[in-house]
Amino acid sequence: MTRILLLLLRFYQYFISPLLSNNCRFHPTCSEYAKEAISMHGSIKGLWLTFKRIIKCQPFCDGGYDTVPISIKNSKPLNKKI
């Protein structure tokens, strides 16, 4: 499922997105955010994070720099015991 979603996103980025105006209020763009979220968190949680991001894409939100949250189980401890 993850592979299919990433292929659909790539198709969108190469064939559909260039036809639309570039007025995304966030960095990275929503499609880049979706690719990163799905790659990091899997299809279900990645789609949920993407949905929440797209909901924020409206005139009452300032936008700006918004990255995919890091998964706790995928992160490495910052301090090691010696």
Swiss-Prot record:
Topology term for the membrane: Peripheral membrane protein
Major localization listed first in the record, in broad terms: membrane
Protein localization: Cell inner membrane
Highest taxon listed in the record's lineage: Bacteria
GO cellular-component term (any): plasma membrane
NCBIfam families the record matches: membrane protein insertion efficiency factor YidD
Function according to Swiss-Prot or TrEMBL: Could be involved in insertion of integral membrane proteins into the membrane.
Protein name as annotated: Putative membrane protein insertion efficiency factor
